[in-house]
Each structure stands twice: as C-alpha cells, then as structure tokens.
C-alpha cells in the first residue's frame, strides 16, 4: 500500500491570507504566491478539515473516512476540527447554487479538504453554471490546485479483480500526474456561436503557458525521483502546437533531474500501452484532458474505481483530496458503496496536506489488513471472501487502525 503515497513533494503550506472572492459563478479569488505547509508550524497538532460530502454515495463514504481519519490521527497525537459544508447538488437543493460562498470560505481557510462525490441524474438538465459539477470546477480553479496526483496500483489481494489478465496486471504501480487548471477545459475562446452561414459552431481552446507546463513538470520529476526514477511525458506533439511546447519545456527541465529517466509518448499510444503493458509505467505526466482520460483508464486496471484516491495540490492554500469515483446515485443510501478510495484519500490528506506521514501509514496498513482478512464490498468481491457493506468495511478498517503498533515511515 505504500505505493499509494510514495511521493514526498513539498507543495503544502502556511495558511493563506484571505483574498478576493467576488461571486458564486465568477470567482476571482487570488492568494499570495508562496508555498503552503500546514505541518511547518512548530508543534502544530490541531488541524481544521473541511468536509464536503456532496451527493449520492458521498455522505456515506465521507462519514466512514472521517472516523478512520480521526482515529489514525488521535493515535499519533493529532486533533481535528471538522467543518461539514454542502456542495454540488446538495447545495443546489439547499441554497440554489453548487458552491455556496460559505462553503468556499470554509474550504479556503481550512488546512485540507476532503470531498466525497458530486453530481447526479436529478440535476442533469440544469443550465451549465447550475450543474453540481461546476462546484468542483470552481474549487479547483480558485484554490489553484494545479497538480492532480492519481495512483493506480494493483494490490496483490485484488489482482484477480482486474479487468486484465493476471500476468499483465500483477505488479502494476504507477502515479499519474495531471495538470488540472489549464488546457482545453479552461482555455479561451470557448463557447457555441453562429457562423456566417447560420450554422452552430462549438469552440474549445487548448492553451498552455510555459510556466504552467514547468510547474507541473517539476512536480512530476520530483514524484518520479521518490518512486522508481522513470517519468513518461504524454502529449500529442505530432499534431498539437500546445503539445509541441509541452514537450519542449519538459525536455528542457530534464537536465535538472539527471537521476530521472525521461521518455515521451503520444497519447494514443499511451492509451494502448496502458492496456498492453501497464507495468512499463512508473510516473506519467500529462495535460488536463489527456490526464482526465488516461487516469480513468488506468483506474480500471486496478479492479475497481472504488479503490483509488486522489490529491489535488497547489503552491498555496489547502489541498483537495477525493476519491476518483462518481456519486453513483444508483446505489446511494443502500450501504453498497466501497469507502476505501475515500479512506485512502484521507491518508493522502494526512501525508500531502498535513505532512503527517505516520498517521497516513496507519491508514494504508489498516486497509491492507482489512483486505488480507477477506473483507470485500460488492465491486471487488469474489467467491471465498466476505461480502460487506460500506459501513462494515469502514468498521473493519477502523479496527485495524486501532490494533496496529505505532507506524514507522
């Protein structure tokens, strides 16, 4: 399980000074450009955690993860002040917007944010700015969390749950570093217009500045340096101008990391290689849209999207930690959700958000222990194991956290 958290990049911070935040749909928050590390405060053992349960199974998995986080922290002498706030569809139903100002303020002033899931069929017909998913867009943009870290590891206990053959899936352990706040999702111009022939035209712009590429590349090089020393940069430099610049900047930085082996791969080939030979990858760095697609593809190698956590980090302000799965409204409220991705997101929160590596390792070890004992939610169940629900899986992890000796890292 150590592979889930096998990175030691210093992107975490001192608390930011509150900035400007103009409206719920056109946020203009600006924070000072400085490194944030909550753990940098000497002797600090009390942290403010913003909990954003969201929609669907979000409240269920957050409730379980909160208990595990609190227990692991208490065993390492940590105290948490939790502030639970509405977001996404839940906020729309409550106050009419996906990200209330009070929610954003609580998130901005916290030491770290743990989010459940956002979205659902109920709000699919809303106007774009009133869709639940826009809350996540605003949070990422305005907290300036530009680096998204998504581990994809096939645990020995779950190798048979992978969609790939055992000999292909066994031993897979990679980290995808995705640029999160630039590219085609944010580029201008964008929108749907009418051309001179009266025909509708949709425009989205893929655009990256050199500094945006450099900062995500540095995160990726540092990540690879702490893992197996291999970095693959994925682009489409044979066609896209933005990718030509991407490759140029990443290549230029490689001289600063002589201990990291850098390779380049076109995104279409990368998508194929993830299925053909996923073990060849250690650390992948790529842009926003390619990372969005490839990380979801990689998640299925592990056997279930319900197993994978993520961390979104910036140069200032709190980090955002969340499972990569969606809100799964079809199983919401039925105690069927797999809480392990959220529990492991809490472990990433401890390590990357707070610098509390021992507490993080307690959670990692507890997840492995629960799996070793045969406990499985429906998405990872196989005959011979014990089928449990969301709550019981959380309880088993909690028992394992309590029974473990002090963690060493």
Swiss-Prot record:
The record marks 137 as: Confers substrate specificity. The record marks 185, 236 as: Important for catalysis. Optimum temperature is 60 degrees Celsius. Substrate binds at residues 140, 150, 178, 268. Mg(2+) binds at residues 268, 292, 296. Its main location: plastid. Pathway: Amino-acid biosynthesis; L-leucine biosynthesis; L-leucine from 3-methyl-2-oxobutanoate: step 3/4; Secondary metabolite biosynthesis. The modification Phosphoserine is found at residue 74. Binds 1 Mg(2+) or Mn(2+) ion per subunit. NAD(+) binds at residues 118-133, 238, 269, 322-338. It is an enzyme of class 1 (oxidoreductase). Its cofactor is Mg(2+); Mn(2+). Involved in both glucosinolate and leucine biosynthesis; catalyzes the oxidative decarboxylation step in both leucine biosynthesis (primary metabolism) and methionine chain elongation of glucosinolates (specialized metabolism). Catalyzes the oxidation of 3-carboxy-2-hydroxy-4-methylpentanoate (3-isopropylmalate, 3-IPM) to 3-carboxy-4-methyl-2-oxopentanoate. The product decarboxylates to 4-methyl-2 oxopentanoate. Required during pollen development and involved in embryo sac development. More active on 3-isopropylmalate and NAD(+) than towards D-malate. This is 3-isopropylmalate dehydrogenase 1, chloroplastic.
